Amino acid sequence: MTQVRNTSAGTSQGRGTRRNSWRVVDIVVAAVLAAVCAVIFWMWSNLLYPLVSASAVAYPPSGGLVAGGWLVAGTLGALIIRRPGAALFCELLAAVLEGFLGTHFGWTVVISGLIQGLGVELVFLLTRYRRFGLLTATVAGAVSGLFLAVGENLMYNYEWATDQKLVYAVFTTLSGAVIAGALMWFVMRALQATGVLGALASGAARRR
Amino acid sequence: MSTTTAPTMFGPRSGLLARANPVVKLLGALLITLVIVLSADPVTNGVALAGQLVLLAGVGLGPWRLLTRLWPVVLAALVSGWGTAMLSDAGGPVLLHLGWITITTGSLGAGAAIALRGLAIALPGITVLLTTDPTDLADGLAQTLGLPARFVLAALAAMRLVEVMITEWSVLAAARRARGAGGGRGPWGVLVEFGGQAFTLLVQSLRRATRLAMTMEARGFGAGPRTWARTPHYGRVDVLVGVAVVAIAAGALAVSLALGTHRFIWQ
Amino acid sequence: MTPRADPAPTGVAVGLENFGWHYPGRQDPSLTGISTTIAPGERVLLLGPSGAGKSTLLQALAGVEQDPDGQSGSGRVTVDGVDPRDARGVVGFMHQDPETQVILSRVGDDVAFGLENLAVPREQIWPRVRQALDRVDLQLPLEHPTTALSGGQKQRLALAGVMAMRPRLLLLDEPTASVDHDGARQLCAAVAGAVRADGITMVVVEHRVALWEPVVERVIVLDDHGRVAFDGPTRQTLHDARELLQEQGTWVPGWVPTTRPPARTGAGPAGPETSPRDHAGAPDPAGSTPGAGEVLLSARGLAVSRVQPPRRAIARRRRRALRAWRHGEPLPEAGPDAQLRPVAAGIDLDVRAGRALAVTGVNGAGKSTLALTLAGLLVPAEGSVRAAEALAAGAAPDPSLWDGGELVSRVGTVFQHPEHQFLRPTVREELEFGPRQLRRRAGRSSARTRGGTPSEADDAARVADLLRRLRLADLADANPFTLSGGQKRRLSVATVLAAAPRVLILDEPTFGQDARTWRELVDLLVAELDRGTAVVAVTHDRDLIAALEAEELRLGT
């Protein structure tokens, strides 16, 4: 009985198959990550509010260009937690909290969060949760942006002319790819350097 | 730093709706939301909005009090209405022609309908928010609706930290100013400083998250079946609220169907 | 877990067999070859240098260690003969951060959380919650919001949450490190009462030995390599290991590290016997060194508040004041504003070159708020803060009107939490940030720094000097967030010093620090005093006040 502690840390759940089961630390970090994304999004909308409302009055689809800010929780959650469902859980919870902080969205945030989280989740599912590189992140962000446009066009923008809906979709996809995709990958890398991800799948350093 | 204080995510709770069970309120709000989201015509949405206002006035939240507290919601609804009026291809006589902006009677009607709908969608969310305790809501979600307890409780614990994060945000602003950060000029400088501040908040919050996970795990969280110290209870108030909500949802549909105006969003 | 009806001695035995821990990516193991047993009911104080793996050991005993790749541990740990992870509810664990030991938003729910997880039947939960709250002397309604608690109360709440689970082994990881003196004593008393009454086995990690000495009966001291250096009865071990402990920076009872006193050139009037209110604006009787004792910053009739006017109102105030100042008119003083709810009022003080001023007072007396107001980071609720020309050096005489660049070269503020002030990805860049900022400004405008604009070479030399003096040279390329607590504290002070401000304002600089970091900080501050820098420290630390020969301003009396 010299080496009994060779199992994974965390919960009793964490002891069996490691890759795909959620430990307590994964769940709690995912939830807090969603919360902090919501707070940052709220600050970001406060900062951009004059700009965004002015541009929304001048040319509504331009709002799609900053839509990526709304989607960061999904990709960041997937990149950090690296568990099936992480994107969906983070994006849904963040959307609900963003809805609470901003209050002008109503319960449709639940639908929005599900649709957008699903977009990210699908991309990582296609890699079977094995690839978390810059490309995957960017594609995930873009798909999430596209899903956002589809959802918004259906739920809110249905009166818009079709070409305007398309412009909006292009804008949100771009914004998703850049802000929620590529940028979040760099954020994940910067977070790895700080050591705060040490307990998570994304932060585990290699053994020498 | 400024007086940007934490928004009252969950305001003071009193009155009939506050005593109703959160799950009933949530499901009711979702039902009304669903009816409005799927319906594009102003009659359905107008009746739904009116019904909600009557219900809220009945429990002591008059339209004036709502307006003074919720003007950003009204503003957002107006902005989205304007956007639609601009971009709708509904025809009719031209009312305004300004550069690329063309507004016709048809598009103005569409815009007005969107603004009305925006208000009607926002209201159920706000109502639940103003009258519900998050802990009670979590109890209901896990015990009544059977959502996974580990995720619901982690979300509840994370929600408590939102307030801590908002306070920390303003401390961070001062702490970084003391180092001379944010010296960059123009919008780019503002963005860079925002990014830096957000990153530090992210680091702090993730640190907190791993410590919180440790605390929760040490208290036996996630180890197996658990009991609940609080039980959600359902009473006469809930029946009343349920009936009112169904009446609003069904009434809105019934009126617009009777008038022949009902239209789904895909129609 | 079936609840035990019998509250008789219930401690469990703890066994460690050749236990070690090596985090992936680290050069050295945190713990090596620890073999010992702890008898049921034994109370142990675990000491050692920071980074020696004390926390890791406690986490392993609690079964909550966060092992990144599942291969960090070696050897064997048992609690009551089984793996700690199979002994949920047997072990109670507390760490030092109050904010993350509160889980739920109501006091009662928070204490009940652990009982729910142990599947205690509902009818037993609430009596046990009340009993646990009584036990830690926290008489609050069950609905009381947890956000309204002080740090010390939060820690006692956490203890109640742990004790309600009726643990048979209590593990405490620096439970009082983030709590003020009174809070620490109350917590300690609550722990002592609980473990003695139930005969619970206890292991506590804490570098404030005096606090726990009366409670524990055995002391284990780890060395730098994570091995057991001393192990034995409290008195004997503390005596035998005293030298090693002092070297490691443990606060052994009756000892304060010796530091050099400030030179105090310039016989200014500031002394411990004079109140700052006594010399309102009186000119300083000539000091022997030019500048020493000279007033750099003063406050008159000052009231301070955390509640600030809206951002736009502050910007308007700033524009108006700057316009008045450019036209040579007096700066407007802040009028009484009831909306701002001052936490402290009627403050008169002078901050003098080469002198230290300690701001003391009970929690909530407005000490930190005063510090931030003096630093120009908050606007006064009433009265004024004025910078003398020697400090303002061409800028407006009110610090709250300075922009970030003007601020760093004049007033350096060290916040209580070092990580809040980190801006760059490496230690070196962090230190270079301030000077670079100044140089960029100097290139842009005519803003002056003390003794003209430093050249790049001067900056590099200053950064190198700071790295060496603060023992951070080996870590120059490390990410600031990865440093230990003491290293972060030293870095946060160094980053501010890198911009060579004439006034240094520190919020609880020595709080929770080990004796080694404490001595280094004091040496650094004394050196700054000797250079003619004015030091303002918000502190509870009597030893610090004595070491800096600081004048004391007591708030809230």
Task: Annotate each predicted stretch with a short phrase.
Chain C
Residues 62, 375:
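Helix-to-loop junction immediately C-terminal to a conserved catalytic motif
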Residues 123-141, 299-302, 445-475:
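Conserved ABC ATPase "signature" region
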Residues 162-163, 496-497:
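ABC ATPase C-loop
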Residues 145-149, 153, 479-483:
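Conserved ABC ATPase signature
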Residues 170-174, 179, 504-507:
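Catalytic Walker B motif of ABC-type/P-loop ATPase nucleotide-binding domains
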Residues 226-249, 546, 556-557:
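Conserved beta-strand-loop-alpha-helix hinge in the C-terminal portion
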Residues 159, 187, 493:
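Hydrophobic anchor residue at the start of the ABC signature
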Residues 76-87, 384-406:
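ABC ATPase NBD Q-loop/coupling interface
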